Regions:
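Acidic, glycine-rich loop-and-beta core segments that form the ion-binding/anion-interacting portion
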Residues: 224-275
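A helix-coil-helix interface module used to build multimeric assemblies
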Residues: 2-210, 215-222
Protein backbone atom coordinates (compact mmCIF):
# COMPACT_ATOMS: atom_id res chain seq x y z
CA UNK A 1 0.00 0.00 0.00
CA UNK A 2 1.04 3.61 -0.52
CA UNK A 3 2.39 5.41 2.53
CA UNK A 4 3.02 9.09 3.16
CA UNK A 5 3.98 11.40 0.30
CA UNK A 6 7.71 11.39 -0.44
CA UNK A 7 9.50 14.63 0.42
CA UNK A 8 12.19 13.77 -2.15
CA UNK A 9 9.93 13.83 -5.21
CA UNK A 10 9.84 16.89 -7.46
CA UNK A 11 6.04 16.80 -7.65
CA UNK A 12 3.04 15.58 -5.67
CA UNK A 13 3.31 18.11 -2.85
CA UNK A 14 -0.49 18.35 -2.58
CA UNK A 15 -1.00 14.60 -2.32
CA UNK A 16 -2.37 13.40 1.00
CA UNK A 17 -0.91 9.92 0.53
CA UNK A 18 2.03 8.27 -1.15
CA UNK A 19 1.99 7.03 -4.70
CA UNK A 20 0.96 3.44 -5.32
CA UNK A 21 4.10 1.33 -5.93
CA UNK A 22 2.66 0.07 -9.21
CA UNK A 23 2.25 3.64 -10.45
CA UNK A 24 5.76 4.48 -9.31
CA UNK A 25 7.23 1.54 -11.21
CA UNK A 26 5.12 2.34 -14.29
CA UNK A 27 6.15 5.99 -14.27
CA UNK A 28 9.90 5.46 -13.86
CA UNK A 29 12.08 5.81 -16.95
CA UNK A 30 15.44 6.03 -15.19
CA UNK A 31 16.51 2.53 -16.23
CA UNK A 32 16.15 3.60 -19.88
CA UNK A 33 17.04 7.29 -19.99
CA UNK A 34 20.09 6.93 -17.74
CA UNK A 35 21.82 6.51 -21.11
CA UNK A 36 21.40 10.31 -21.38
CA UNK A 37 23.38 11.08 -18.20
CA UNK A 38 26.20 12.92 -19.98
CA UNK A 39 23.90 14.91 -22.26
CA UNK A 40 21.68 15.83 -19.31
CA UNK A 41 24.65 17.09 -17.33
CA UNK A 42 26.11 19.09 -20.21
CA UNK A 43 22.70 20.62 -20.86
CA UNK A 44 22.37 21.56 -17.20
CA UNK A 45 25.80 23.20 -17.13
CA UNK A 46 24.94 25.24 -20.24
CA UNK A 47 21.63 26.22 -18.63
CA UNK A 48 23.31 27.25 -15.38
CA UNK A 49 25.89 29.30 -17.28
CA UNK A 50 23.14 31.11 -19.19
CA UNK A 51 21.32 31.82 -15.92
CA UNK A 52 24.56 33.15 -14.43
CA UNK A 53 25.01 35.46 -17.42
CA UNK A 54 21.48 36.80 -16.82
CA UNK A 55 22.24 37.43 -13.14
CA UNK A 56 19.91 34.68 -11.91
CA UNK A 57 22.89 32.81 -10.43
CA UNK A 58 26.00 34.44 -8.99
CA UNK A 59 29.52 33.28 -9.86
CA UNK A 60 29.87 31.15 -6.72
CA UNK A 61 26.54 29.40 -7.28
CA UNK A 62 27.40 28.60 -10.88
CA UNK A 63 30.86 27.32 -9.93
CA UNK A 64 29.35 25.01 -7.31
CA UNK A 65 26.69 23.71 -9.69
CA UNK A 66 29.29 23.05 -12.39
CA UNK A 67 31.62 21.34 -9.91
CA UNK A 68 28.82 19.20 -8.52
CA UNK A 69 27.50 18.17 -11.92
CA UNK A 70 30.96 17.14 -13.08
CA UNK A 71 31.28 15.01 -9.95
CA UNK A 72 27.92 13.40 -10.73
CA UNK A 73 29.13 12.67 -14.26
CA UNK A 74 32.26 10.99 -12.91
CA UNK A 75 30.09 8.79 -10.69
CA UNK A 76 28.11 7.66 -13.73
CA UNK A 77 31.27 7.02 -15.74
CA UNK A 78 32.85 4.96 -12.96
CA UNK A 79 29.66 3.01 -12.24
CA UNK A 80 29.43 4.42 -8.71
CA UNK A 81 26.18 6.34 -9.16
CA UNK A 82 23.46 4.83 -6.98
CA UNK A 83 19.89 5.09 -8.29
CA UNK A 84 17.20 5.55 -5.64
CA UNK A 85 14.15 3.47 -6.66
CA UNK A 86 10.90 5.34 -6.14
CA UNK A 87 12.72 8.69 -6.03
CA UNK A 88 14.82 8.89 -9.19
CA UNK A 89 12.00 8.57 -11.70
CA UNK A 90 14.16 9.75 -14.60
CA UNK A 91 17.70 10.86 -15.38
CA UNK A 92 16.86 14.51 -14.70
CA UNK A 93 15.58 13.94 -11.17
CA UNK A 94 18.42 11.51 -10.45
CA UNK A 95 21.12 13.98 -11.44
CA UNK A 96 19.52 16.88 -9.59
CA UNK A 97 18.89 14.80 -6.46
CA UNK A 98 22.55 13.76 -6.37
CA UNK A 99 23.69 17.32 -7.10
CA UNK A 100 21.78 18.47 -4.01
CA UNK A 101 23.53 15.85 -1.91
CA UNK A 102 26.94 17.04 -3.11
CA UNK A 103 26.61 20.84 -3.00
CA UNK A 104 23.52 21.29 -0.84
CA UNK A 105 19.91 21.77 -1.84
CA UNK A 106 19.94 25.55 -1.39
CA UNK A 107 22.22 26.05 -4.38
CA UNK A 108 21.28 22.91 -6.33
CA UNK A 109 17.63 23.93 -6.17
CA UNK A 110 18.41 27.02 -8.25
CA UNK A 111 19.65 25.00 -11.22
CA UNK A 112 16.19 24.40 -12.62
CA UNK A 113 15.10 28.07 -12.45
CA UNK A 114 13.12 28.88 -15.60
CA UNK A 115 13.59 25.43 -17.13
CA UNK A 116 11.01 22.73 -17.80
CA UNK A 117 11.63 19.01 -17.99
CA UNK A 118 9.72 19.21 -21.28
CA UNK A 119 12.60 21.06 -22.92
CA UNK A 120 15.21 19.21 -20.86
CA UNK A 121 14.27 15.76 -22.13
CA UNK A 122 14.00 17.05 -25.70
CA UNK A 123 17.52 18.47 -25.48
CA UNK A 124 18.90 15.22 -24.03
CA UNK A 125 17.27 13.11 -26.73
CA UNK A 126 18.50 15.32 -29.55
CA UNK A 127 22.07 15.45 -28.23
CA UNK A 128 22.22 11.70 -27.63
CA UNK A 129 20.74 10.90 -31.02
CA UNK A 130 23.09 13.33 -32.76
CA UNK A 131 26.08 11.60 -31.20
CA UNK A 132 24.83 8.17 -32.20
CA UNK A 133 24.31 9.39 -35.77
CA UNK A 134 27.82 10.87 -35.76
CA UNK A 135 29.21 7.44 -34.87
CA UNK A 136 27.17 5.68 -37.53
CA UNK A 137 28.19 8.29 -40.09
CA UNK A 138 31.85 7.61 -39.32
CA UNK A 139 31.34 3.85 -39.75
CA UNK A 140 29.48 4.36 -43.04
CA UNK A 141 32.22 6.59 -44.43
CA UNK A 142 34.87 3.99 -43.56
CA UNK A 143 32.71 1.24 -45.07
CA UNK A 144 32.30 3.17 -48.31
CA UNK A 145 36.04 3.74 -48.53
CA UNK A 146 36.61 -0.01 -48.27
CA UNK A 147 34.02 -0.71 -50.97
CA UNK A 148 35.61 1.86 -53.30
CA UNK A 149 39.13 0.58 -52.63
CA UNK A 150 38.24 -3.08 -53.15
CA UNK A 151 36.27 -2.25 -56.29
CA UNK A 152 39.31 -0.53 -57.78
CA UNK A 153 41.76 -3.28 -56.73
CA UNK A 154 39.56 -6.11 -58.01
CA UNK A 155 38.13 -4.45 -61.10
CA UNK A 156 39.30 -7.28 -63.40
CA UNK A 157 37.45 -9.97 -61.45
CA UNK A 158 34.46 -11.30 -63.39
CA UNK A 159 31.44 -13.17 -62.00
CA UNK A 160 27.98 -14.25 -63.15
CA UNK A 161 25.20 -11.75 -62.70
CA UNK A 162 22.03 -13.38 -61.41
CA UNK A 163 18.31 -12.81 -61.78
CA UNK A 164 16.18 -14.98 -59.46
CA UNK A 165 19.37 -17.00 -58.74
CA UNK A 166 19.65 -17.87 -62.43
CA UNK A 167 22.80 -16.91 -64.32
CA UNK A 168 21.96 -14.00 -66.61
CA UNK A 169 25.00 -12.00 -67.76
CA UNK A 170 28.70 -11.77 -66.91
CA UNK A 171 29.52 -8.75 -64.75
CA UNK A 172 32.52 -7.39 -62.92
CA UNK A 173 32.80 -8.17 -59.20
CA UNK A 174 33.36 -4.44 -58.68
CA UNK A 175 30.05 -3.72 -60.42
CA UNK A 176 28.26 -5.85 -57.83
CA UNK A 177 30.11 -4.18 -54.94
CA UNK A 178 29.44 -0.68 -56.22
CA UNK A 179 25.73 -1.44 -56.58
CA UNK A 180 25.69 -1.65 -52.79
CA UNK A 181 28.16 1.19 -52.54
CA UNK A 182 25.60 3.43 -54.23
CA UNK A 183 22.87 2.27 -51.84
CA UNK A 184 25.08 2.97 -48.81
CA UNK A 185 26.15 6.33 -50.26
CA UNK A 186 22.48 7.27 -50.53
CA UNK A 187 22.02 6.12 -46.93
CA UNK A 188 24.90 8.38 -45.90
CA UNK A 189 23.34 11.32 -47.72
CA UNK A 190 19.98 10.67 -46.06
CA UNK A 191 21.65 10.33 -42.64
CA UNK A 192 23.17 13.78 -43.01
CA UNK A 193 19.78 15.20 -43.95
CA UNK A 194 18.18 13.57 -40.90
CA UNK A 195 20.94 14.89 -38.66
CA UNK A 196 20.20 18.45 -39.78
CA UNK A 197 16.69 18.11 -38.35
CA UNK A 198 17.90 16.33 -35.22
CA UNK A 199 20.53 18.96 -34.42
CA UNK A 200 18.20 21.83 -33.54
CA UNK A 201 18.04 23.15 -29.99
CA UNK A 202 14.77 23.33 -28.03
CA UNK A 203 16.55 24.63 -24.90
CA UNK A 204 14.84 27.80 -23.75
CA UNK A 205 11.40 26.75 -25.03
CA UNK A 206 10.11 26.23 -21.49
CA UNK A 207 7.14 23.98 -20.81
CA UNK A 208 5.45 25.30 -23.95
CA UNK A 209 5.60 29.11 -24.13
CA UNK A 210 9.24 30.11 -23.85
CA UNK A 211 11.48 31.47 -21.11
CA UNK A 212 10.39 34.49 -19.04
CA UNK A 213 13.93 35.68 -18.26
CA UNK A 214 15.16 36.32 -21.80
CA UNK A 215 17.82 33.63 -21.53
CA UNK A 216 20.38 33.51 -24.35
CA UNK A 217 19.23 30.52 -26.40
CA UNK A 218 21.89 31.03 -29.06
CA UNK A 219 24.72 30.86 -26.52
CA UNK A 220 23.36 27.61 -25.07
CA UNK A 221 22.89 26.10 -28.53
CA UNK A 222 26.47 26.97 -29.49
CA UNK A 223 27.86 25.52 -26.26
CA UNK A 224 25.99 22.26 -26.82
CA UNK A 225 26.93 21.93 -30.49
CA UNK A 226 23.54 22.58 -32.07
CA UNK A 227 23.39 24.02 -35.58
CA UNK A 228 20.33 26.18 -35.00
CA UNK A 229 17.29 26.76 -32.77
CA UNK A 230 13.73 25.50 -32.88
CA UNK A 231 12.00 28.88 -33.00
CA UNK A 232 8.48 27.81 -32.07
CA UNK A 233 8.47 26.85 -28.40
CA UNK A 234 5.45 24.55 -28.59
CA UNK A 235 6.98 22.65 -31.50
CA UNK A 236 10.29 22.49 -29.64
CA UNK A 237 8.94 20.56 -26.68
CA UNK A 238 6.24 18.51 -28.44
CA UNK A 239 8.06 17.31 -31.56
CA UNK A 240 9.35 13.74 -31.71
CA UNK A 241 9.38 13.50 -35.51
CA UNK A 242 13.17 13.46 -35.41
CA UNK A 243 13.06 10.14 -33.52
CA UNK A 244 10.62 8.55 -35.97
CA UNK A 245 12.58 9.87 -38.94
CA UNK A 246 15.79 8.36 -37.55
CA UNK A 247 14.06 5.02 -37.13
CA UNK A 248 12.75 5.20 -40.69
CA UNK A 249 16.26 5.95 -41.91
CA UNK A 250 17.67 3.08 -39.85
CA UNK A 251 15.12 0.68 -41.33
CA UNK A 252 16.29 1.51 -44.84
CA UNK A 253 19.95 1.12 -43.87
CA UNK A 254 19.24 -2.28 -42.31
CA UNK A 255 17.35 -3.35 -45.44
CA UNK A 256 20.42 -2.59 -47.56
CA UNK A 257 22.74 -4.31 -45.08
CA UNK A 258 20.46 -7.35 -45.06
CA UNK A 259 20.48 -7.61 -48.86
CA UNK A 260 24.26 -7.24 -48.94
CA UNK A 261 24.73 -9.87 -46.24
CA UNK A 262 22.32 -12.27 -47.96
CA UNK A 263 24.30 -12.04 -51.20
CA UNK A 264 27.56 -12.68 -49.37
CA UNK A 265 26.07 -15.68 -47.56
CA UNK A 266 24.91 -17.18 -50.86
CA UNK A 267 28.20 -16.44 -52.61
CA UNK A 268 30.16 -18.06 -49.78
CA UNK A 269 28.17 -21.32 -49.98
CA UNK A 270 29.67 -24.45 -51.54
CA UNK A 271 27.37 -24.14 -54.56
CA UNK A 272 28.73 -20.68 -55.46
CA UNK A 273 32.09 -20.44 -53.67
CA UNK A 274 32.84 -16.87 -54.80
CA UNK A 275 33.76 -15.51 -51.36
Amino acid sequence: MAGAPSSEKLWGGRFTGGQDPLMTAYNESIYYDRAFYSQDIRGSIAWARANKNKGILNDHEFAEIERGLKEVEEEWKSGKFSIKPGVDEDIHTANERRLGEIIGKNIAGKLHTGRSRNEQVAVDMRMWLREQLDNIESFLVDFLKVIASRSEQEIEHVMPGYTHLQRAQPIRWSHWMLSYGLAFANDLERLREVKQRVNRSPLGCGALAGNPFGIDRDAMANELGFDTLIYNSMAGVADRDFVVETMQWGSMLMLHLSRWAEDLIIYSSAEFNFV
